[in-house]
């Protein structure tokens, strides 16, 4: 969780960037490595200079995540250019892609609970 209190403007810009990047991935990026990538959140610095873009992929293969990360890095320039076209902000932030492992962690916890329940029967 960020240490700073987020302004309404910062929250609004984060939401806009999340929607726009999601749309860009679906409509304008043709890289098959990004087919199942979902943008789960954006966390921007208070000065709007950096946007941490959290993503996940719905695949059990570890290689899919690595390929998706490589695909996002390859598409970063295109995504940033398209953001610049679509947004009215003065400056487009630098994009740093980070894999969101919360869903995978939640699945792991559910599996552990199911295993414990099965063993206790």
Swiss-Prot record:
It is found in: Cytoplasm. Disulfide bonds: none annotated. Keywords: Cytoplasm, Ribosome biogenesis. GO terms for biological process: maturation of SSU-rRNA. InterPro entries: KH_dom-like_a/b (IPR015946), RbfA (IPR000238), RbfA_dom_sf (IPR023799). GO terms for molecular function: ribosomal small subunit binding. GO terms for cellular component: cytosol. One of several proteins that assist in the late maturation steps of the functional core of the 30S ribosomal subunit. Associates with free 30S ribosomal subunits (but not with 30S subunits that are part of 70S ribosomes or polysomes). Required for efficient processing of 16S rRNA. May interact with the 5'-terminal helix region of 16S rRNA. Belongs to the RbfA family. PANTHER family: RIBOSOME-BINDING FACTOR A, CHLOROPLASTIC-RELATED. Monomer. Binds 30S ribosomal subunits, but not 50S ribosomal subunits or 70S ribosomes. This is Ribosome-binding factor A. It comes from Oenococcus oeni (strain ATCC BAA-331 / PSU-1).
């Amino acid at each position: 969780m960020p240490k700073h209190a987020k302004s309404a403007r910062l929250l609004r810009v984060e939401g806009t960037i999340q929607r726009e990047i999601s749309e860009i991935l679906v409509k304008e990026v043709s890289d098959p490595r990004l087919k199942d990538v979902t943008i789960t959140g954006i966390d921007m610095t208070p000065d709007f200079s950096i946007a941490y873009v959290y993503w996940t992929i719905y695949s059990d293969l570890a290689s899919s995540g690595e390929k998706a990360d490589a695909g996002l890095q390859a598409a970063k320039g295109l995504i940033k250019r398209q953001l610049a076209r679509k947004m009215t902000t003065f400056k487009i932030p630098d994009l740093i892609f980070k894999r969101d492992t919360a869903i995978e962690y939640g699945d792991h916890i559910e599996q552990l609970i199911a295993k414990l329940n099965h063993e206790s029967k």
